[in-house]
Amino acid sequence: SLEMNNVQLVNRLISNVCEISGHKILNGQLDNTEWERLDRKLRDLTGAPIYVDDTPGLSVFELRTKARRLVREKGVKLLMIDYLQLMNANGMKFGSRQEEVSTISRSLKGLAKELNIPVLALSQLSRNVENREGLEGKRPQLSDLRESGAIEQDADMVLFVHRPEYYHIY
């Protein structure tokens, strides 16, 4: 994760897996059933093959090197990036940030093919969605992907999280 550090990410993972509020876990405000569930789920997670790298400003080159090693040595079967726009393209100079994000996107596509594993890259949306009206207006579109038109071209699949209740639209 490029957005959260290891501790934050692990805390969120534990909260999600245990289905217990992160606030309750951090404050130790759990009832007996929740303590038992936390204990049981932590034992399961302890041996899970999950590797987190929170290197800030990770470049595509650094990611490729680390991913190759993890696939070779640990048998990693999925690579997740949180999130694409926090990466950089190996210190290369670009005319715009859009060109750089496009290069990053193409590099991730190449990495997925090279390693023969899926690469799931999260992306930020532009603010355009916030300015549109109504239920359909708030639904994210491919053109809302921030800083690149290449993401939609490079991706095998693009999924959006859309919560109408967030906008009080039912």
Residue spans of the language-model regions?
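Cytosolic-facing regulatory segments adjacent to core modules
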Residues: S1-G75, A89
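Conserved nucleotide-binding/hydrolysis micro-motifs of P-loop NTPases
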Residues: M4-V7, N16, P56-S59, L84-M87, ...
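Short glycine/proline- and charge-enriched loop/turn segments
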Residues: N16-G22, F94, R132-L142
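Short, basic, glycine/proline-bearing loop/turn elements
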Residues: A48-D53, F94, R127-E136
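Conserved ATPase-coupling elements of RecA-like P-loop NTPase cores
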Residues: N88-G95
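Phosphate-binding/switch region of NTP-binding enzymes
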Residues: E99-Y170
